[in-house]
Amino acid sequence: MPGLNLTREEATERASIISSVTRYEISLDLTRGDTDFGSFTRIEFDAREGASTFADLVSNNVHSITLNGNALDPFSVHQDNRIALENLAEHNVLEVEASCQYMHTGEGLHRFVDPADGQAYTYSQFEVPDARRVYTTFEQPDLKSTFTLTVKAPKGWKVFSNAPTPTPEEEGEAWVYRFATTEVMSTYITAIVAGPYEGTTATLTSSDGRTIDLGVYARASIVEHLDADEIIEITRQGFEFFEGAYGIAYPFTKYDQIFVPEYNAGAMEDAGCVTFRDAYVFRTRPTEAQMEARANTILHELAHMWFGDLVTMKWWNDLWLNESFAEFMSHLALAEATKYTEGWTGFMVRKDWGLKQDQLPTTHPITAEIRDLADVEVNFDGITYAKGASVLRQLVSYVGRDAFFAGLHEYLTKHSYANATLDDLLSELAAASGRDLASWSKVWLEEAGVTLLRPVITTAEDGTIERLEITQEAFSEGASLRPHRMGVAGYSLTEEGTLAQVFREELDIDGASTVIEAAAGITRPDFILVNDGDLGYAKVRLDEQSLAFAINNITKFTDSLTRGVVMASAWDMTRDGEMPARDYLNLALRAVPVEDNMSLLTLTLRHIDEAVRTFVAPKYRAEAAEDTGRRLLLLARTAASGSDAQRMLVAAAARNATSLEQFEAIRALYDGTQTLDGLDLDVDLKWGLLIALVRGGAATEEDIAALEATDDTMTGHQNAAAARAAREGEWIKADVWDKVLTDTSIPNDTRWAMISGFWAQARTTPSAYAGYVGEYFEALAGIWETFTFHTAEDLTTLLFPNALAGYVPEVDVVASGKAWIEAHADASAGTIRIIRELIDVCERQIANQAVDAG
């Protein structure tokens, strides 16, 4: 039974039968209550006469189905989310009327009631296969069509879709919106957003002289925090940059950006109607890192309007190309067209995600085999985004920037409003550059894993370099040695105590060894850095002298990107057991006071948290945790008044507080009996402090209720749920565990908040959670039977007891995980993959704890 799945073979067969989908006409009725909505679909399509195929619809109540004027029995032909279509004509008309169901998981048509004012909001999220939860479809990207949408909504609601929003017609107590027909597009990038959204409008002139209407919207209760001017400015800069880079005008008629609640992703590139999670509407003062991340997301989705929406992959095996391209282009635009000129440092931070994913036992080639929709879901990861984008950056260097964009222009022009493949793109790039990309594609795109680069320095008696070579080895099994375009540089301290670059060479590194000619004969620098400028995608090692220098002189590296590469190399060595966790903590805590790039500071603080939580040896953990909390609190107190760093360090100190003295200091900040000059103790920061206090037994239910009463919002209630789950007590943890596993009415964001609170004491009293190892594996099969894929995936990951690995002698998380896999060979590929990855995380933790123990 297919269930919700679709195989590539089925999609290929259906596309061979359906020669074209002429048009969709869709009517939705959103006035029928809070559980169901009306859905009528009329599809005109051409097919091979006499053949049979199927359409897709997820609905528990199909009222009528008509094919070419003949009524079909819904009970007979609508089975397993498919509508059987037999004995097709050359020209066909399918009409389906159904009641579809609102979702609360961010899939299909999501419905949300704002606790701040009781207003209801809806929005769609269709990637990968969820348009079929809203209307009848041929749910695959290569069966493109036009869409004409009519929506009946409660009076006062605004409705947005891919075409411009028309003036509504009154119909009793409802408004009816009749949208114009869209451009040709795939079903997964169609959109419906409806509710009492409020916002700001503007216009811009496209490169072909058209006026493009812009809109930025959010819920009424948070619209006061919507800094639309900043968002519109980034959007204008992105339009100008992308139209210039692609040589093609914006391909749709308008551009709305709508910030929506309880989103299960960051954003979605629906054509001309982009949705974002409304955590990007900052209700308190954002850090520079948060502003840059939002700008990058805005540009990422805008880049998709050409690459992904105008030209779309034929099948999901090229999803990586879609996302990697947008990831690369957004950072390029960020650095070259906006005020966020250090955008490539943020790119380096994102690369951390890809490198981690690439070292898991489930790593896959960038061009992974996607046999069905289940494969899409499990391969939508750091390789799809971060590694792919890094490899595209290498490709730009390999073929040359001018040739890259010339080839890209030809690709987008030839396949406009149609579908294409990776081979189509590579052929255009090869033609534009004159380079044969077959061998490059094989080692970079068709093989999994990562290689490791290491400097080997031979020094003469007089201190000069006789030979500097970069060796390359296949760190991952099966990975070939790859060509890399990157910089290698040397740095030394000056007499004034500053750090100066004494040589740099940008070159192609290929094969097992590459000699750096620029270094020959010069005095050995204090520090040698492979991948200076972060052009490459590889694991990079520091030689022994350079590592020692970095530990003692990290504050001397004034360029954020250089500093970031140094810190990334040190962290990678820590993860691989070549640098004890406590040594990394010493380096990182020395780097924090001088870190002026907030994206890099965010990453460093995240790595500090991870090192203390998982890599420090059990016998040293209490001491290391207390020392880390103390030093972070001191750094917070000495940070620049009112700075982003001050705010981030206060939050980090609270997360890492362990001693009575530290909790007393956090409590004094929370109560206002002690203050830090310039620190704005806003409601978001107060929640972070309060959750930490609850974790340490320094705050109560009364404190939670008092703060929640002042923050009667979605975010406030989610934070309160996290705080309540963070309370100590066996019955409290048992209640949280039961609710997140059984109560399907809980919104996912609230569920994730509760789980974060559940594990609050895992670092200080891990043995208290020992019983949940068995309970987790007993519940695992039921999770995948009860919840949708996205929810099941997150539950499986967030409830996994990796926090106990190595720290609770009476349980063996690794052995339990392996035993579960052995006993459940018939489990879904997605489930098995996640458990294998989490077992690997635990094995790495235990190995690194042994290294740290000495």
Describe the predicted segments one by one.
Residues 39, 126-129, 137-299, 328-331, ...:
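Hydrophobic helix-coil surface modules that form long, contiguous segments used
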Residues 70, 179, 215-479, 603, ...:
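Hydrophobic alpha-helical and helix-loop surface patches within well-folded domains
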Residues 8-16, 97-148, 195-200, 534-560, ...:
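Glycine/proline-rich low-complexity spacer/linker segments in large multi-domain proteins
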Residues 1-38, 115-121, 141, 438-442:
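N-terminal, polar/Ser/Thr-rich
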Residues 61-68, 437-438, 450-531:
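Beta-strand-rich binding/interaction modules
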